[in-house]
């Protein structure tokens, strides 16, 4: 699609076609942000609001999501901070993007696209921020993207979790 390669999606944690489809939905929203010159909030189906969010100024990408898998660092400053909880989005379930940030995401996708959360990382983008305390968390009981190996580090993974 539009010069975006798929090699980065061939990995052990996710099902290839499902992962590409999820990335494509984010990519289309980035395009919409650029085309309409609008800042967008990107939410996945399992995003659950714990607190309201009001106008927080930011430059490119601002994560609102509590880390949903693996180990992470808790920011020690309340409010907007440089992304430190992980070196990549701690799950792509809740973030906002400006038209400038969306343009950077689109350009980088043509260089090295991969699963959305690890694609949006400090190594690729120098201006990712996160808001703490995290006002949104994942409430998931199933996945259509990950393989079992990709689910093992999810905080909500248990014997009732379903891989569809």
Predicted regions and their residues:
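An acidic/histidine-cluster motif and surrounding catalytic segment
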Residues: 1-43, 47-164
């Amino acid at each position: 699609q539009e010069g975006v390669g798929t090699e980065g999606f061939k990995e052990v944690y996710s099902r290839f076609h499902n992962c590409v489809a999820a990335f494509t939905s984010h990519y289309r929203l980035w395009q919409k942000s650029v085309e309409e010159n609008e800042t967008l909030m990107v939410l996945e189906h399992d995003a659950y609001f714990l607190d309201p969010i009001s106008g927080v100024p930011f430059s490119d990408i601002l994560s609102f999501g509590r880390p949903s898998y693996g180990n992470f660092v808790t920011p020690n400053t309340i409010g907007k901070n440089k992304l430190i909880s992980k070196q990549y989005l701690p799950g792509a379930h809740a973030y906002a993007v400006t038209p400038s940030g969306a343009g950077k995401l689109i350009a980088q996708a043509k260089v090295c696209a991969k699963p959305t959360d690890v694609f949006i990382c400090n190594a690729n983008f120098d201006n990712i921020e996160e808001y703490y305390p995290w006002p949104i968390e994942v409430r998931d009981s199933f996945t259509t993207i990950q393989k079992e190996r990709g689910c093992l580090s999810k905080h909500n993974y248990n014997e009732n979790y379903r891989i569809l």
